[in-house]
Amino acid sequence: MADDKKIIFSMVGVSKSFQNNKQVLKDIYLSFFYGAKIGIIGLNGSGKSTLMKIIAGLDKNYQGEVVFSPGYSVGYLAQEPHLDDTKTVKEVVMEGVQSVVDTLAEYEEINNKFGLPEYYEDPEKMDALFARQAELQDIIDATDAWNLDSKLERAMDALRCPPEDQPVKNLSGGERRRVALCRLLLQKPDILLLDEPTNHLDVESIDWLEQHLQQYEGTVIAVTHDRYFLDHVAGWILELDRGEGIPWKGNYSSWLEQKTKRMEMEEKTASKRRKTLERELEWVRMAPKARQAKGKARLNSYDKLLNEDVKEKEEKLEIFIPNGPRLGNKVIEAKHVAKAYGDKLLFDDLNFMLPPNGIVGVIGPNGAGKTTLFRLIMGLEKVDKGEFEVGETVKVAYVDQQHKDIDPNKTVYQVISGGNDLIRMGNRDVNARAYLSRFNFSGSDQEKLCGMLSGGERNRLHLAMALKEEGNVLLLDEPTNDIDVNTLRALEEGLEDFAGCAVVISHDRWFLDRICTHILAFEGNSEVFFFEGSYTEYEENKMKRMGNVEPKRVRYRKLMED
């Protein structure tokens, strides 16, 4: 429970600007209570990760003051965490309980000393060893350290960490994040800073993490685009909007309600301001020379109003998904498809039929075969048996997770345009800059080098590259990773307006609930279930089908016993 009388961290007038004089944080005043659960939201580039780095003590180049109450610890999960590549998964995870590991090591060292002549021949040294051994025994008993291995195994299983003996240097980006998160949760810092903690976690792991954080004694501050996570965990929302930090007491749904009302008020104010601007502009244009002095004063008034209008305007995000050729009734049908890698069977006798105008959400644990399914449909891999029947009118656009085809040394505009002002889309030519603007790349954003893009910007660019081909069937592999909540809404609206069929791999439950007409669920044990309805309806159906039998890992267990 949050203690609203114990402030453990404060920011006093904190501002942050980059070398290009862009101010991302402006005069932030905040105080965090012990035990509070805070979700940070805002557009990409609004300063969310910068704020986290300041709190973590990694960024000291700011104006203002940061005050920690003495005696409290801070732990930080970065988007790209640093791990020691010379260690194994278990060795890294054990760093989270280093004091326990050190206690066990010292206890073992003392036991070894009992057999050395320099100790057993010296009564004083033996007495000192016995005394220290007793102290360590009390610590070990109090922390249940003898069961450390089973506790670490439970922690790694909860977050789907790779095998404990796997070298860290061989891990993927997602695996590294899961290992780093496991290590951090075992440390139990008083202030837990999580930058996109749900990225690369499957739904079951996210459910487990939500329950763990709900019961977490310390303060949790999380940057995340997962709106269900914000609903279930956050008791406060901190919105970063045009440099300002706007706190709200409540979860995401309650914040969304007040945000809508606030935007309505801003629109009314903006409407009045626009009318005033129009009158001022008309007067300025018509003012005779005889009233030049007054004209200058009113021109200054006009400029002030214009600046306020620019300041108050919040950009409406839009992602445009062009419709491909008309899609017939036959889309893609899986018939008795099977696929295995060695002894690992991903699925056997897979059957489903994609709906012509549907949006199919693909869910399941990491490694279950979701991405493999897309690669099989695209012909990038071969089925072991069965087949995919593809309709004659189908034109597939595939957006994978890798983004390997983005040249980091080219600008956004160069990647999309190929050096041409017009790009060919179907039977028509489209202005390349206009096309990019439909994916929320403004004029200055279009000149950014791709190597400098954020994760969300790279996702939008990759989406624009794939959709340029005007497919009528979209295969989207984790398109919601690394993009902010506003961009997520724009993507949802773009998909809802899309006339073809979309198949989307995602762990974002809010996203799945809002747009999906069908769910293709990888349920474990090589079983795949095709369901017509939303994600929540699928979950209800799943509980009815399973009865009291819960799948492995659904039941919540504490990371470490107290």
Predicted ranges, named:
Residues 258-291, 295-301, 305-312:
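Intracellular alpha-helical coupling/juxtamembrane segments of multi-pass membrane proteins
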